[in-house]
Amino acid sequence: MEELDFSSKTTTSRLKLFGFSVDGEEDFSDQSVKTNLSSVSPERGEFPAGSSGRSGGGVRSRGGGGGGGERKYECQYCCREFGNSQALGGHQNAHKKERQQLKRAQLQATRNAAANFSNAGSASQFLRNPIVSAFAPPPHLLSSSAVPQPMGGPWMYLPRVSPSQLHVSHGCVIQDGSGGAGAGGFSYEYGARDSGFGVVGAQMRHVQAHGPRPSVNGFSREVGTTFDDGLGLDLHLSLAPAGH
């Protein structure tokens, strides 16, 4: 009996190497089958017995969990979609460069406008009235002391004629150079006479500061002839031919 028990114990004992039994051919073949089943790809749906299939569920959520299958990256400037983050980053960098160039151009334009405004500040009063600015000199070029004062000279060239022989034709105003330049001015008296031409002639009185006030009393034939002879002109109307 003891020999039989010993033989049964020796036959039932197994030798294991790294957790695998190497004594029985049947056990070794079963273990190899299990390892082959565990190495099969989970995408084909072949999972070993007792496995929960977690790896297959991750692939489904990545591949078609939401129905699209691909993640989109949208640009915050133009709302354009890209397939990866690298393409989106390069696209947004281009947007940033364009915005920097635009800001630089705006700053340069603002500086130029400020410089032009400061340079034209002295002439701003002439910009309100362009007609005045065309004829009036700038105030900073000529001071009040440097502006020449108007001289009381004759307004037109006349031959030497005595003050009593002044003749005014066609309402012209003539200032005598012999009179005082600081006179109070001129006073005019217009009157109409009976003729076919309506208003005929005018009377002018030259006011002087000192001395008598000579006046022109109408149009006399003698004074008019003397004045016209001095200029070499004949301004009298006549129906007779010239020279008579």
Swiss-Prot record:
Q: Name one GO molecular function term.
A: DNA-binding transcription factor activity
- List the InterPro entries hit by this protein, alphabetically: GIS3/ZFP5/ZFP6, Znf_C2H2_sf, Znf_C2H2_type
Which residue ranges have biased composition labelled Gly residues?
A: 53-68
Disruption-associated phenotype: Decreased number of trichomes in cauline leaves, lateral branches, sepals and main stems.
Where mainly found?
nucleus
Zinc finger (C2H2-type) positions are 73-95
Q: Which GO terms describe its cellular component?
A: nucleus
Where composition is biased (Polar residues), the residues are: 30-41
Positions of the region Disordered? 26-69
Query: Where is coiled-coil annotated?
Result: none
Annotated keywords = Cytokinin signaling pathway, Developmental protein, Differentiation, Gibberellin signaling pathway, Metal-binding, Nucleus, Transcription, Transcription regulation, Zinc, Zinc-finger
Q: Which GO terms describe its biological process?
A: cytokinin-activated signaling pathway; gibberellic acid mediated signaling pathway; glucosinolate metabolic process; regulation of DNA-templated transcription; trichome morphogenesis
Q: Where in the cell is it found?
A: Nucleus
Q: What does this protein do?
A: Probable transcription factor required for the initiation of inflorescence trichomes in response to gibberellin and cytokinin. Acts upstream of GIS, GIS2, ZFP8, and the trichome initiation factors GL1 and GL3. Binds the promoter region of GIS and GIS2, which may be direct targets of GIS3.
The entry's other comment says:
Plants over-expressing GIS3 have increased trichome densities in sepals, cauline leaves, lateral branches, main inflorescence stems, and have ectopic trichomes on carpels.
Under what name is this protein listed?
A: Zinc finger protein GIS3
* Species whose genome carries this gene: Arabidopsis thaliana (Mouse-ear cress)
Per the record, the gene is GIS3
